[in-house]
């Protein structure tokens, strides 16, 4: 009986070939394919039945012939070996095998000599004892049986090598087929987010029609169809009632009607008026509409602006008169407006009378002044700003472009690009390198033969810069100018200037190793030396040698350009001065114990005492920024209207795009803006109006120990180069000040000169997998600018081999090629690939998405910590483990239709959940790309746990007598993180997501496992002695029950 999948496939093919399909025809074709002996014979029979003799019919016959199951005669391997051995013995009576040195496969035989026969017989006599009456045939049978054992042993040894080689070749062939399928899918799916697509109604209709064949959706489709019909029926009946009233008025207008007829007519009319009024009330919804600030000529529509002033004096129209509560609602709005707390709007000059004195204010010492360079005086800058205010928005943008320092060197830059294939460009931050160079290349005609790609180390920078360039060019974002980041592709076929993260360009190299669609590649912010940037250096260097027509520009904001030049074969350096105003550097007189509190106090002191000008503060991450924002709002609220308005604008990677754009909005007159940023604001973003910089002197850096496999995100002191970059932010538009929350002694003696490249301090497993996918196998000799530790590379190769991504020759397997498609850690990718075997891929991608967003899912307000902990533990009911708890969180949120209120009630960060949903949607699309079916097995949680263990089996630990855990491989004492749901249960065996180093070595995201699973899922990694659980050993009190 053919499987359902085969029947569905044949049915689809019949629809394509003939235009119809029936179950009987499908079964008949499958039976016919089973009976035929070759595809050619099947083609002949199909043509006889009416199929066209075309290539489509031939390919259909070949595919169905290959797909249908066939009956094969079972062969007894033992009998086969017995027969082969008997044949060899018979041949050996006349032939003997001689050793041949030239080829293993060639065997030279010749006649046996009498001496060899006599020796053979002698040996036979010694080996076998004849019984009385035993015939020669019995001796022959014994000899055959003995020789057959020898032959089987020899054949099995040869088969082990040949089977492993055949398996390797088969796996390589399957991997090549998978890569070809991926390329075909990419070619077929050319539509992007910004292309001209169907309307919303057409999309909904297309989706509804596509799902119409799904039996599970039939009920919901019927329900939706009935609801839509009721809406149409309501409007239809309303029109019929109106027509009926009009007809009766026309026909019986002058006639005398009875009382019953009059009552019925009045009833119809009242009913129609009520329904009509309700419809008008529903249509009259109060909503905000984005105002059009400028007309087509670029000027302000003054009449529209001043029409608001006379709004209260105009007469009400007919629709407003129908609202009897309009006056009441207006009065309520007025009263609510008076009762609303407002502060900062009066703009009192309180500093003229007195100054605030903060109890915990900090004493700063003016140490030095950073000299300015190529800057304008205050009068010229003020006159230029007045001139810009009189121009239209488009003229203002063009004038700003011409005022950038790089504009003076435009022609020289284009000439240098034309004369040299590789060019190193050096210019200060804010000089216009990122926004202007791609536009200059576009204007010079480089985009006629390919795109101009510009990489950025951060997602926020790629999005904001692309939006700015699109605005300057006067085009819509996503058309001529677009961006591509990890979970968003805002490009189209029209895109010629493409901004992207360096990681996205690495992923593009998987499908296009020679970057054939690009004419120019710009590696921007090269001085940051991120992991992806260092890998790109080696790849684009080889591509530039292979493609002489490709232009390669390396852009940096620091003067350490000689190193880049030497790496790229002594490439020429094009440097130009920026515009930098003098910056006063202030250090604290004594070290600060709490840099968070010191930063808050410094912000308030600047806001109260210093002249107007925006403030930029550097923090290490999102958590610190949100904490500082909360404290600032609380303290400002206490000061009320005594101080000017302070606008707080955070900026970090996970912040939504609309909130990120607020940092670029001009500050209202009389107010001050404070930007709370990560180190993204050092070089990637340029914010106008910044006059004061507060530098705590710390940043978050990844640190990886290849021996223990522990990767931690540590808060570490910045380098002197980063400190200089941060101080330079204050001198962009006017003379400024930088407040460093550390002493001058710390700066001179404790800070490193430059930041350690990320490639030397992070886990390289995903990078090694990406390079292997690109066909780069000699990783030790890969052309790194700063080579990573050899031990880290070896550990990464060992991990990938253990995960099955590499074979014993170091070649990429089909599973490894699938894993490379997922933008995740290799162990997470392996977990997803294995989930296809256990039919739980739907649950696993939800867990992977939740793990990818880190530990920012639950939050604990200081005043409601007990409630938050109880809400979190509700998801751990039954000691299911942290992974299953994350799955419960996402599933529960999905069941509430992604409710924001549900997140508030359960103390879950809705922003993190939305990001997890975006990640999951992308992973779901990648499942189809790598040919993995989406399946669900929520009732069988052991299948989910086995998939987790299959990906994270190197991360296992066993409970010790003292209540701590010991990792099985590379023994190390670790503990379950206090936030884990199993921190009090203490199971005997656990698998963990990652190790983090805080006050102790903690395991995060822990799930219980059965030790026998390790032998089942990773027999190549674990032996029986590794997982033997001595049940007789005494465990600590309160230890968890045995593994499930």
From Swiss-Prot:
Residues 600-775 form the Helicase C-terminal domain. Residues 122-132 have a biased composition (Basic residues). SMART domains: DEXDc, HA2, HELICc. It catalyses: ATP + H2O = ADP + phosphate + H(+). SUPFAM superfamilies: P-loop containing nucleoside triphosphate hydrolases (SSF52540). Involved in pre-mRNA splicing. This is Pre-mRNA-splicing factor ATP-dependent RNA helicase DEAH1. The lineage of its organism: Eukaryota, Viridiplantae, Streptophyta, Embryophyta, Tracheophyta.
């Amino acid at each position: 009986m053919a499987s359902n999948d085969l029947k569905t496939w044949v049915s689809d093919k019949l629809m394509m070939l003939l235009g119809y399909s029936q179950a009987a025809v499908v079964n008949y074709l499958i039976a016919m394919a089973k009976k035929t002996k070759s595809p050619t014979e099947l083609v002949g029979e199909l043509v006889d039945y009416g199929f066209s003799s075309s290539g489509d019919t031939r390919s259909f016959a070949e595919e169905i012939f290959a797909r249908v199951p066939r009956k094969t005669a079972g062969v007894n391997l033992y009998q086969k070996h017995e027969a082969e051995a008997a044949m060899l013995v018979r041949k050996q009576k006349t032939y003997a095998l001689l050793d041949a040195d030239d080829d293993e496969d060639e065997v030279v035989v010749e006649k046996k000599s009498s001496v060899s026969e006599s020796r053979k017989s002698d040996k036979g006599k010694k080996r076998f004892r004849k019984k009385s009456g035993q015939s020669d045939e019995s001796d022959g049978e014994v000899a055959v049986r003995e020789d057959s054992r020898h032959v089987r042993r020899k054949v099995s040894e040869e088969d082990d090598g040949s089977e492993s080689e055949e398996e390797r070749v088969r796996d390589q062939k399957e991997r090549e087929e998978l890569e070809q399928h991926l390329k075909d899918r990419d070619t077929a799916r050319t539509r992007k987010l910004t292309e001209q697509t169907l309307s919303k109604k057409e999309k909904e209709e297309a989706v509804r029609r596509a799902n119409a064949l799904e039996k599970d959706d039939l009920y919901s489709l019927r329900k939706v169809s009935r609801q839509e019909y009721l809406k149409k029926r309501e409007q239809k009946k309303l029109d019929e009632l109106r027509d009926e009233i009009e007809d009766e008025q026309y026909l019986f207008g002058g006639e005398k009607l009875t009382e019953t007829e009059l009552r019925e007519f009045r009833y119809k009319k009242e009913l129609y008026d009520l329904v009509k009024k309700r419809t008008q009330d529903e249509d009259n919804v109060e909503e905000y509409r984005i105002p059009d600030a400028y007309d087509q000529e670029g000027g302000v529509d003054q009449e529209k602006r001043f029409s608001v002033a006379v709004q209260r004096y105009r007469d009400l129209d007919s629709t407003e008169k129908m609202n009897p509560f309009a006056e009441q609602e207006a009065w309520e709005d007025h009263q609510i407006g008076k009762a609303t707390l407002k502060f900062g709007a009066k703009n009192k000059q309180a500093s003229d009378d007195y100054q605030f004195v903060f109890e915990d204010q900090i004493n700063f010492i003016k140490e030095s002044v950073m000299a300015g360079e190529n800057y304008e005086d205050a009068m010229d800058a003020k006159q230029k700003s007045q001139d810009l205010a009189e121009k239209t928005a488009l003229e203002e943008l063009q004038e700003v472009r011409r005022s950038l320092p790089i504009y003076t060197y435009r022609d020289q830059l284009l000439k240098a690009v034309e004369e040299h294939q590789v060019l190193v460009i050096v210019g200060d931050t804010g000089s216009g390198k990122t926004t202007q160079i791609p536009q200059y290349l576009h204007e010079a005609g480089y985009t006629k033969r390919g795109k101009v790609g510009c990489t950025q180390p951060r997602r926020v920078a790629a999005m904001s810069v692309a939006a700015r360039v699109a605005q300057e060019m006067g085009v819509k974002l996503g058309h001529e100018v677009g961006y591509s980041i990890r979970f968003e592709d805002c490009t189209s076929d029209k895109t010629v200037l493409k901004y992207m993260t360096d990681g996205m360009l690495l992923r593009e190299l998987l499908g296009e190793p020679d970057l054939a669609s690009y004419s120019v590649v710009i590696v921007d912010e090269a001085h940051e030396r991120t992991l992806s940037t260092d890998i790109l250096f080696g790849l684009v260097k080889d591509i530039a040698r292979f493609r002489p027509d490709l232009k390669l520009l390396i852009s940096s904001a620091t003067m350490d350009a000689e190193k880049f030049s030497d790496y790229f074969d002594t490439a020429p350096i094009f440097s130009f001065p920026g515009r930098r105003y003098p910056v006063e550097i202030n250090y604290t007189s004594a070290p600060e114990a709490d840099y968070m509190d010191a930063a808050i106090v410094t912000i308030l002191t600047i806001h109260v005492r210093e002249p107007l000008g925006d403030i930029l503060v550097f923090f290490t991450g999102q958590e610190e920024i949100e904490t500082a924002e909360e404290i600032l709002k609380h303290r400002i609220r206490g000061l009320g209207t005594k101080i000017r308005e302070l606008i707080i604008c955070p900026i970090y990677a996970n912040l939504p795009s609309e909130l990120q754009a607020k940092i670029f909005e001009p500050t209202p007159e009389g107010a001050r803006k404070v930007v709370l940023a990560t180190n993204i604001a050092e070089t990637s973003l340029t914010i106008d109006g910044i006059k004061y910089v507060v530098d705590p002197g710390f940043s978050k850096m990844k640190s990886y120990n290849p021996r223990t496999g522990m990767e931690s995100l540590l808060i570490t002191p910045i380098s002197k180069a980063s400190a200089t970059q941060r101080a330079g932010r204050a001198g962009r538009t006017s003379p400024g000040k930088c407040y460093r929350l550390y002493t001058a002694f710390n700066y001179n003696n404790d800070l490193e000169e430059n930041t350690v490249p990320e490639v030397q301090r992070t886990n390289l497993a995903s990078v090694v997998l990406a390079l292997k996918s690109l066909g780069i196998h000699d990783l030790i000799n890969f052309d790194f600018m700063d080579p990573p530790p050899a031990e880290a590379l070896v550990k990464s190769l060992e991990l990938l081999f253990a995960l099955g991504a590499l074979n014993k020759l170091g070649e990429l397997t089909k599973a490894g090629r699938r894993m490379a498609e997922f933008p995740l850690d290799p162990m997470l990718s392996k977990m997803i690939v294995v989930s296809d075997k256990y039919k739980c891929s739907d649950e696993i991608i939800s867990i992977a998405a939740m793990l990818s967003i880190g530990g920012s899912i639950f939050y604990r307000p200081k005043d409601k910590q007990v409630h938050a902990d109880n809400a979190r533990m509700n998801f751990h009911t039954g000691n299911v483990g942290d992974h299953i708890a994350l799955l419960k969180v996402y599933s529960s949120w999905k069941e509430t239709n992604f409710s924001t209120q549900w997140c508030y009630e359960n103390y879950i960060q809705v922003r993190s959940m939305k990001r997890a949903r975006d990640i999951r949607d992308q992973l779901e699309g990648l499942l189809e790309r790598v040919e993995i079916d989406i399946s669900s097995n929520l009732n069988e949680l052991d299948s989910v746990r086995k998939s987790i263990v299959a990906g994270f089996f190197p991360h296992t630990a066993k409970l010790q007598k003292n209540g701590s855990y010991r990792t099985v491989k590379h023994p190390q004492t670790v503990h379950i993180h206090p936030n884990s749901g199993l921190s009090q249960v203490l199971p005997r065996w656990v698998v963990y997501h990652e190790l983090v180093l805080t006050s102790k070595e903690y395991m995060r995201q822990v799930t219980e496992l059965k030790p026998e699973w390790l032998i089942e899922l990773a027999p190549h990694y674990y032996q029986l002695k590794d997982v033997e659980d001595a049940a007789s050993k005494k465990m600590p009190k309160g230890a968890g029950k045995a593994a499930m």
